[in-house]
Amino acid sequence: MTRIQNSHFRQEGTIMPVIFSEKKRHEISRQIKEAALRLFKTKGIRKTTVAELAESVGIAKGTFYNFYATKGQLVAEIMDDFDAASERELRNKIGGRDKIPIAEFYKYYVELFRPDTAFSFHFTPDDITVMQEMEETRKFFSQESTVYKGLHRVGI
């Protein structure tokens, strides 16, 4: 993993943020998400600090907030990514059909949550409770979730 240099420099006694290119912003954001998943898996969301996330990718704690307003916003973006990937995967599997047999959907759903590939496997049991409490992630436990919509669509 490439370490990112400190994103602040001193100019006339002040600390000024460095402006990142879109490409660099995307790369740093990806690194933050990867670090978050690693740390969440071992420590949980509640015990993972913004300082640890920033340090793990080589940025200042304050620079983290140039990417995410809160840790909850980071978790929500990770969940959005998973939700979008799940929807793409489901669309690929159903091949343009409007409906699929329940057995086929169930097979897909079981594959999606296999422990070796599952998004949920990156979180501790306490994390589900934490995510239900976070305003930024609450929607994933409601009817807005792609997985929830898919289950509802097939009558589950």
Task: Name each model feature, range by range.
Residues 1-27:
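N-terminal intrinsically disordered/low-complexity leader segments
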Residues 17-19, 68, 133-134:
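A short, mixed-charge helix-start or loop-turn motif at secondary-structure junctions
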Residues 31, 39-73, 77:
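Helix-turn-helix
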Residues 44, 88-93, 122:
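Short C-terminal boundary/hinge segments that cap the last helix of small helical domains
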Residues 75-82, 89:
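Alpha-helical DNA-contacting segments of helix-turn-helix folds
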Residues 77, 91-118:
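Hydrophobic alpha-helical connector segments
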Residues 111-156:
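Short secondary-structure transition hinges
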